[in-house]
Amino acid sequence: MSNISTDLQDVEKIIVLDYGSQYNQLISRRIRDIGVFSELKSHKISAAEVREVNPVGIILSGGPNSVYEDGSFDIDPEIFELGIPILGICYGMQLLTHKLGGKVVPAGDAGNREYGQSTLTHTPSALFESTPDEQTVLMSHGDAVTEIPADFVRTGTSADCPYAAIENPDKHIYGIQFHPEVRHSVYGNDILRNFALNICKAKGDWSMDNFIDMQIKKIRETVGDKRVLLGLSGGVDSSVVGVLLQKAIGDQLICIFVDHGLLRKGEADQVMDMLGGKFGLNIVKADAAKRFLDKLAGVSDPEQKRKIIGNEFVYVFDDEASKLKDVKFLAQGTLYTDVIESGTDTAQTIKSHHNVGGLPEDMQFELIEPLNTLYKDEVRALGTELGMPDHIVWRQPFPGPGLAIRVMGEITEEKLETVRESDAILREEIAKAGLDRDIWQYFTVNTGVRSVGVMGDGRTYDYTIAIRAITSIDGMTADFAKIPWEVLQKISVRIVNEVDHVNRIVYDITSKPPATVEWE
């Protein structure tokens, strides 16, 4: 199985070297917001590999390590000699200081450990251009710079950090001890914009329009006269991929809609009517519900569920593809966040992603992932640019394994039906309350827990349904949605009264992190 993804070699970009910060994806996202493409790269990247990538700038992210400890994340020192502008953030500043001859010590030893918002005072610098001399920033460091390298100057201080910003403007190397990527740093976006546009001299012309042109060209070059299969779920990601591919290769695209019996209420009909009818996509419907549910019988481990569904999904494709000629490629709606969350050099894999870790090694297709460099909100912007209507572009995210990962424990028809019906009620009431565009994602989960209840004159022992609703910008971090109590109450009353085998509703008030969006 080979993987053909977006070719960004010729795109002006700033790379972010990943040192394990919880915020490193936000750095990339903020740079893109400025109009410059940005992506994460391993901190193990060599200077020669950086030359091949040819970025206009490099950002060294924060991280949990201490530069003076054995085994801490390092950098190829030749990168500092490439002449490419560099910005070190937090650990990144400490690392460049350490490698270039300065001194870093535990902040407790220097008496200047800082966590939380602080006031930065800076002197004139291209990095701080058009920002106030005093500004609020977020500090989060247990170590501190006590001596700066030769030819560097101090440009920023705080009450507890004598070297909050340093630079060598002749070599275009900058370091800041705070985190400009988080919103707690009030002028953080301005600082990143100064680095990207003024110091790196980026044009700032990255846009979805450019992305469409680039991807269409790349898809046509890759596919040639062969045919492409797309697994169409009806969700935002696969729908956008479908419209993009059709724009690129027309009738060479064959969409296979696999009804695996794990869809939301009425979803199968919506997919066929909306994408097959309105947009004219060539859709083959595979009714495979019994096949999937038979394979999932007795399985309760979430990772095993994902693997089974991933394997069966592709095997269904194999069955359908065997009926077709000249099919060489399989398209997927994998996003950048999917790739990141499935593990990097600096982080453990939290859970295999359904678009990354569930594919069998003997798959007969080459893989095309046109969206795997985009965040979720960028995919929505891409859909709008492609002329797709809001009710598709702003549709709720839905995982590839479907309701299988919204049913805790073993999957049964009874459990699936409780989730289908309760989810339909939730979506209906959220829309009635005018909250459907304010809440990033919302759904129900059958927790697998039964509890005692009283309905009418009788005792019940039925399922507990959890409501999960979050607000987010890009899916990397999220907070639980503050749904008005009267709306929650109405949802709860309707579910208990209208959905069989349910007698209790709970609301998930956990943010991401520590929790993930989905329960499995």
UniProtKB/Swiss-Prot annotation:
Residues 206-395 form the GMPS ATP-PPase domain. Pfam families: GATase, GMP_synt_C, NAD_synthase. The active site is at 90 (nucleophile), 179, 181. Keywords: ATP-binding, Glutamine amidotransferase, GMP biosynthesis, Ligase, Nucleotide-binding, Purine biosynthesis. It comes from the Bacteria. The keyword Nucleotide-binding applies. GO terms for cellular component: cytosol. Residues 13-205 form the Glutamine amidotransferase type-1 domain. InterPro entries: Class_I_gatase-like, GATASE, GMP_synth_C, GMP_synth_GATase, GMP_synthase, GMPS_ATP_PPase_dom, NAD/GMP_synthase, Rossmann-like_a/b/a_fold. Pathway: Purine metabolism; GMP biosynthesis; GMP from XMP (L-Gln route): step 1/1. One of its GO terms (molecular function) is ATP binding. It is an enzyme of class 6 (ligase). Its EC number is 6.3.5.2. ATP binds at residues 233-239. The keyword ATP-binding applies. It catalyses: XMP + L-glutamine + ATP + H2O = GMP + L-glutamate + AMP + diphosphate + 2 H(+). Gene3D superfamilies: 3.30.300.10, 3.40.50.880, HUPs. CDD domains: GATase1_GMP_Synthase, GMP_synthase_C. Catalyzes the synthesis of GMP from XMP. HAMAP family: GMP_synthase (MF_00344). This is GMP synthase [glutamine-hydrolyzing]. It comes from Streptococcus pneumoniae (strain P1031). The lineage of its organism: Bacteria, Bacillati, Bacillota, Bacilli, Lactobacillales. The gene is guaA.
